[in-house]
């Protein structure tokens, strides 16, 4: 318990426990956020391949919840001892397979969220299957999809999030390209169709959507 208290109040960084765990997909979100130590993130973050942010966030979540469960288990055992429970071994056995699904509401509020972030290529295209897997996983993981409607990281090519007839910096109108001839992939509708996640479609014009 002394170690747990130290980790929450100070930890290796002397700033206490992190408020969030951030898994970034290589791409536009990497460029917008710049590279360490010049990025603006005041919390631990990791950068992975274009398509892997949702999948890695699943592993990050499971590992983090295992660590949180160990802490909560120690607290529950201490509470049982303070309450004078005589069968300490039985109390310990009841927590043998204790996991995040058994956390109380108060315990869940103490768990920093895990957030996966990626742009059009990472979520609409090459990593679409990983995004779908996270939506179906039933884990309280947050995913932020940056809908720039082009492949921003590589200069602005047309991509699945663009609208019919789209022209862009790297796909200008000309003899060989008369505009995008595919309909837009509506990621919000596809996400809602999974039936397992809360979907919010926001806009930078109203930044309170993100708060």
Regions found by a protein language model. Name each.
Residues 188-211:
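Structural signature of the thiamine diphosphate
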């Amino acid at each position: 318990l002394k170690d747990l208290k130290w980790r929450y109040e100070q930890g290796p960084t002397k700033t206490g426990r992190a408020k969030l765990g951030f898994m970034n997909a290589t791409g536009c979100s990497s460029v917008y956020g710049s590279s360490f130590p010049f990025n603006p993130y005041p919390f631990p973050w990791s950068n992975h391949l274009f398509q892997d942010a949702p999948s890695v966030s699943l592993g990050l979540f499971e590992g983090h919840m295992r660590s949180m469960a160990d802490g909560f288990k120690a607290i529950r055992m201490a509470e049982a001892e303070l309450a004078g429970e005589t069968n300490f071994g039985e109390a310990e056995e009841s927590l043998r397979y204790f996991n995040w699904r058994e956390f109380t509401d108060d315990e869940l509020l103490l768990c920093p969220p895990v957030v996966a972030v990626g742009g059009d290529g990472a979520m609409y295209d090459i990593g679409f299957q990983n995004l779908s897997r996270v939506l179906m996983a039933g884990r309280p993981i947050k995913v932020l999809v940056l809908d720039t409607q082009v492949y921003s990281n590589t200069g602005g090519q047309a991509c699945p999030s663009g609208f019919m007839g789209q022209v862009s910096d790297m796909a200008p109108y000309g003899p060989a390209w008369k505009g995008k001839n595919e309909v837009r992939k509506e990621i919000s509708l596809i996400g809602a169709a999974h039936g397992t996640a809360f979907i919010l479609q926001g806009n930078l014009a109203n930044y309170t959507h993100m708060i």
